Amino acid sequence: MVYKCHDTFMVRTPAFPLSVARNVLATEKSEVWNYIKKIGIDEYMLEAIFVSSPSLYDAILKIGKDNKKDQATFVSLYKYLLRASSRTTPIGLMATVGLGHFSLDEESYIEKKNNLDKKIMISYSWIYKLVKELQQDQNVLDRISVVWNKNTYMTSSRIINPYFANHGVSEQNEHKNVSIKSTKLTQFIKDNTENSIKYSELIFSICGIYKGVCREKIVSTINALIEKEFLFTELRIPAYCDSPIEYILSILRKNNINTNLQYNLKKILHEIKVYEEKNGGVQSLKKRKIRWKKSVVTNCT
């Protein structure tokens, strides 16, 4: 197969030109905030720092009240500005990208534009936490579908999940093996979930075969398989998902689950859209952050 390189490519860029870094290096740390205001990037810096370091944002607002604390604030600002103008950074509004073009010129350069399109991406750690809490709600489970994790494998007496990620919410970001004892019940569940099936239908099928087993034990077994990721629910975010919230909303709508949560998630999407379209500044972002928290952050289900 023959591949041809496209003339246009995407490149990560510093938020500010290299000339800013040179000027910062020649500036006393105690004067860095005055320099930021002088070149007219104070509003942008405030917004970017509000996203990446709320504590530093609060400290900037208090400049002039405590000289000792001011000096620590200036040092932090100095480091932020130096990094943002000398190398790419992976966080918040400092994580800028641009489009480049191949040319015959030997010298490369970055053309700075006056406009900046801002895009917001919801933290996946919050998304995973929301999904996990939904999957711990029996009323939700009773309405959604499950499917067997194809990455698992059998040994003589156990079923192994070689990649347990704790639904993406592990603080240590650790992945480990987990295993369960292979029984007739777990084998029946595995055989009947090779393709997606409603949780409630799976319960019904098991109860029809294992009439002497109480329903609570069957539910407990299935829920344990979900917890250990031997079973995936349809709430699991697929790879390369453009909008996790839209995906979760589609599952909630399809199965008529938690209309209050649906409403709040729609509000978040609307606030994000308005902020991006209006290219709002720090005050706009602060107002929306407060409304997001009131919507679902404090109580996602």
Annotate each PLM feature:
Residues 190-201, 211-213:
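Short capping segments at the starts of secondary-structure elements
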